[in-house]
Amino acid sequence: MAKVLVLYYSTWGHVETMAKAVAEGAKAAGAEVTLKRVPETMPEDTAKAIHAKTDQDAPVATPAELADYDAIIFGTPTRFGNMCGQMRNFLDQTGGLWAKGALIGKVGSVFASTGTQHGGQETTITSFHTTLFHHGMIVVGVPYSNPELTNMNEITGGTPYGATTLAGADGSRQPSANELAIARAQGKHVAGIAAKLAG
């Protein structure tokens, strides 16, 4: 049984919702799944001022524990076409793991949230991949065997690089059924590959 960590940061809850769907998909594939988030770096008064969702249930992860899993599926909101600062800060603390080669051969995957269709969802995921490659991880996306990726009946997130959702300019749009289906498919796909690699 593969051990899968779904590790995310979410300001307003969009990535949190996607993370739960990813975890559902991984569990459906028979994986032992852990859902955690990275620490908040935003000052508390700022978080309150922007109405950030601070009541998230997932426990906070530590960089050292990444080595305990066969696969890690990362979730991040987009910040100017890149991962958010909270996730970057967390990953910048994984130098010790890199020095030991602790993540070499583990499966890595990424999902994201953007404000709009053209808000940088693909660049966020592909630029995130650079860190995973430096750790020697096996990067996995979402195959086109999932029909939701080619859905042209609505405005929707979703890429072969990883699941995405569109939050809307004011954050009011929630992940759609189509986007959540892609997230579940990503979790299932990653868990299946991790199980095969784990033997």
UniProtKB/Swiss-Prot annotation:
Cofactor note (record): Binds 1 FMN per monomer.
What chemistry does it catalyse, as a reaction equation? a quinone + NADH + H(+) = a quinol + NAD(+); a quinone + NADPH + H(+) = a quinol + NADP(+)
Under the heading PROSITE patterns, the entry gives: FLAVODOXIN_LIKE (PS50902)
**Residues bound to substrate:** 98
Per the record, the similarity remark reads: Belongs to the WrbA family.
Tell me which cofactor or cofactors this protein depends on. Answer: FMN
Q: What is this protein called?
A: NAD(P)H dehydrogenase (quinone)
- Keyword NADP applies: yes
Residues that, per the record, bind FMN: 10-15, 78-80, 113-119, 134
Specify the domain of life of the species encoding this protein.
Bacteria
> NADP: is it a keyword of this entry?
yes
Which Gene3D superfamilies does this entry report, sorted A to Z? Answer: 3.40.50.360
GO MF annotation list: flavin adenine dinucleotide binding; FMN binding; NAD binding; NADH:ubiquinone reductase (non-electrogenic) activity; NADP binding; NADPH dehydrogenase (quinone) activity
Q: Which organism was this protein described from?
A: Acidiphilium cryptum (strain JF-5)
Q: Which residues form a coiled coil?
A: none
Recorded hits in InterPro entries, A to Z, give:
Flavodoxin/NO_synth (IPR008254), Flavoprotein-like_sf (IPR029039), Flavoprotein_WrbA-like (IPR010089), FMN_Rdtase-like_dom (IPR005025), NQO (IPR037513)
How would you classify this enzyme at the top EC level?
oxidoreductase
What HAMAP family has UniProt attached to this entry? NQOR (MF_01017)
E.C. number(s) listed in UniProt = 1.6.5.2
User: Domain Flavodoxin-like spans what residues?
Assistant: 4-190
Keyword entries, A-Z: Flavoprotein, FMN, NAD, NADP, Nucleotide-binding, Oxidoreductase
One GO cellular component term noted in the UniProt record for this chain: membrane
The record lists NAD(+) as bound by: 12
